[in-house]
From Swiss-Prot:
Catalysed transformations (reactions): [protein]-L-isoaspartate + S-adenosyl-L-methionine = [protein]-L-isoaspartate alpha-methyl ester + S-adenosyl-L-homocysteine
PANTHER family reported for this sequence: PROTEIN-L-ISOASPARTATE O-METHYLTRANSFERASE, PROTEIN-L-ISOASPARTATE(D-ASPARTATE) O-METHYLTRANSFERASE
Pfam family, one: PCMT
GO BP annotations listed: methylation; protein modification process; protein repair
Gene Ontology cellular component terms for the protein in this record: cytoplasm
Keywords per UniProt: Cytoplasm, Methyltransferase, S-adenosyl-L-methionine, Transferase
Protein name: Protein-L-isoaspartate O-methyltransferase
Amino acid sequence: MNSIKNHLMCEEIHKRFNLHPKVREAMESIEREVFVPAPFKHFAYTLNALSMQAQQYISSPLTVAKMTQYLEIDHVDSVLEIGCGSGYQAAVLSQIFRRVFSIERIESLYIEARLRLKTLGLDNVHVKFADGNKGWERYAPYDRILFSACAKNIPQALIDQLEEGGILVAPIQENNEQVIKRFVKQNNALRVQKVLEKCLFVPVVDGVQ
């Protein structure tokens, strides 16, 4: 039954956003309900963002699909996610990338996300409890970096950890609005490749909690 609900959810996403076949397959293979808090299970297959603990949210599946596809997913190996949250975005990425690394700064969310990912047997996802602004130098460089929270700017540490020619996608705070931007690394610096759309994400915060 849940797989049917997940399929129908992906149909609704596809009506609004032309899904890459690999992204659609990834979205259909990961049951969103696993990542949704118990009080909101009946909303798991809607296109709504849903509240979690610590004043955080599990993103809309439409947003997850878009952010995944904005990474330009063909012929890439590794991705670093900043802001693991529920683990849903990392789980979707795991169906496309050979190696997924995700950082979460809130310990309670980190513990729950790691457990969910382990329960699903997603052994190619590695989760770390740390300040995402510092990245994860041990496994760098990464082909792709994805921010699942809104940044005012991109820390130099993350630019350094992105492969030359690699792509970074992030919601960026500009004045009173947020916009999703895709950057490419050229000559050791980030260049805006495309401004994709307006958005609404929780902010990137320094330190751990």
